[in-house]
Curated annotation (Swiss-Prot):
<dbReference type="GO" id="GO:0005829">
    <property type="term" value="C:cytosol"/>
</dbReference>
<dbReference type="InterPro" id="IPR008278">
    <property type="entry name" value="4-PPantetheinyl_Trfase_dom"/>
</dbReference>
<comment type="function">
    <text>Transfers the 4'-phosphopantetheine moiety from coenzyme A to a Ser of an acyl-carrier-protein. Activates the peptidyl carrier protein (PCP) domains of surfactin synthas.</text>
</comment>
<dbReference type="GO" id="GO:0000287">
    <property type="term" value="F:magnesium ion binding"/>
</dbReference>
<dbReference type="InterPro" id="IPR055066">
    <property type="entry name" value="AASDHPPT_N"/>
</dbReference>
<dbReference type="Pfam" id="PF01648">
    <property type="entry name" value="ACPS"/>
</dbReference>
<dbReference type="GO" id="GO:0019878">
    <property type="term" value="P:lysine biosynthetic process via aminoadipic acid"/>
</dbReference>
<dbReference type="Pfam" id="PF22624">
    <property type="entry name" value="AASDHPPT_N"/>
</dbReference>
<dbReference type="GO" id="GO:0008897">
    <property type="term" value="F:holo-[acyl-carrier-protein] synthase activity"/>
</dbReference>
<dbReference type="InterPro" id="IPR037143">
    <property type="entry name" value="4-PPantetheinyl_Trfase_dom_sf"/>
</dbReference>
<dbReference type="InterPro" id="IPR050559">
    <property type="entry name" value="P-Pant_transferase_sf"/>
</dbReference>
<protein>
    <recommendedName>
        <fullName>4'-phosphopantetheinyl transferase pptA</fullName>
        <ecNumber>2.7.8.7</ecNumber>
    </recommendedName>
</protein>
<keyword id="KW-0808">Transferase</keyword>
<comment type="similarity">
    <text>Belongs to the P-Pant transferase superfamily.</text>
</comment>
Length: 263
């Protein structure tokens, strides 16, 4: 499993580059991108759409041969024939980072059980960290288990508490994205004990699952992310992403290269 992380800064991404890259995705995707009111949101969506296309091009697939579809729950997947081994991918973004996790599609076709999430380490404005945690673990919106809440609200520096919270959150998101499940999944069914590096689903070990953690930094801001994939077997695996399996690009360079490769 690998992750490509694209670092987007709107000040370094000229409008001409956006316009030049737009024709390299199909008309339906272009229409979706153009519906965004803010140009930076459109650019993030465009980059997210280019990522799997560049990956397929590296596999020797021409742009005209690339085809995609979505599951009933809206998860995109590759329908290009004769990809061997089959390809699983998932794209996510938060603020300046657009990330794609990908790997061989072994189980859970057609979209395969692979998901990724990334989040910037920050507290929303005008609230404290404890208020932030309360907002996602109250009776009305209870998305942390008691164990997770105790871990993130322990007597530790806020920076470490914030990291713990977002490790928990991104793992839960990556897992549900790997399943291809939309909104509505009860996050309390998933528990990630960041101290013991243990993931349980409905109280049982998450057997057969790989979870790979990664970090990205940009302009003084830090991001954490998790890629999740079901590979089968008995024992779950939770480790940092292997060195060399995380590749970061700045957005302008990536999109310029995408244009060159997809011509």
């Amino acid at each position: 499993m690998q992750v490509w992380a694209i670092i987007y800064d709107k000040a370094d991404f000229p409008d001409t580059l956006y316009q030049n890259a737009l024709p390299f995705v199909d008309q339906a995707v272009q229409s979706k991108i153009k519906r965004f009111h803010r140009r930076e949101d459109a650019c993030r969506s465009l980059i997210g759409s280019l990522l799997p296309r560049v990956l397929l091009r590296k596999r020797g697939v021409s742009r005209d041969e690339m085809t995609f579809a979505t599951t009933e729950n809206g998860k995109p997947y590759c329908t290009t024939p004769d990809i061997d081994p089959p390809l699983g991918f998932n794209v996510t973004h938060d603020e300046s980072v657009i990330a794609m996790a990908f790997g061989s599609g072994d189980l859970g076709p057609p979209a395969y059980n692979l998901g990724v999430d990334v989040m910037q380490l920050k507290v929303p404005p005008r609230i404290t960290f404890s208020e932030f945690v309360d907002s996602v673990s109250s009776q009305e919106s209870d998305q942390l288990t008691a164990r997770e809440r105790n871990i993130v609200l322990a007597d530790i520096p806020e920076g470490e508490a914030l990291r713990r919270f977002y490790w928990v959150w991104t793992l839960k998101e990556a897992y549900t994205k790997a399943l291809g499940i939309g909104l509505g999944f009860d996050f309390r069914r998933i528990q990630y004990d960041v101290l013991e590096e243990k993931v349980t689903i409905d109280g049982e070990l998450a057997r057969g699952w790989q979870f790979r953690k990664f970090e990205v930094a940009h302009s003084g801001n830090k991001y954490v992310g998790v890629a999740a994939r079901f590979v089968g077997g008995r024992n779950p695996s939770i480790t940092d992403l292997d060195e060399g399996s995380l590749v970061c690009y700045d957005a302008a360079s990536f999109v310029n290269r995408a244009i060159e490769e997809l011509v």
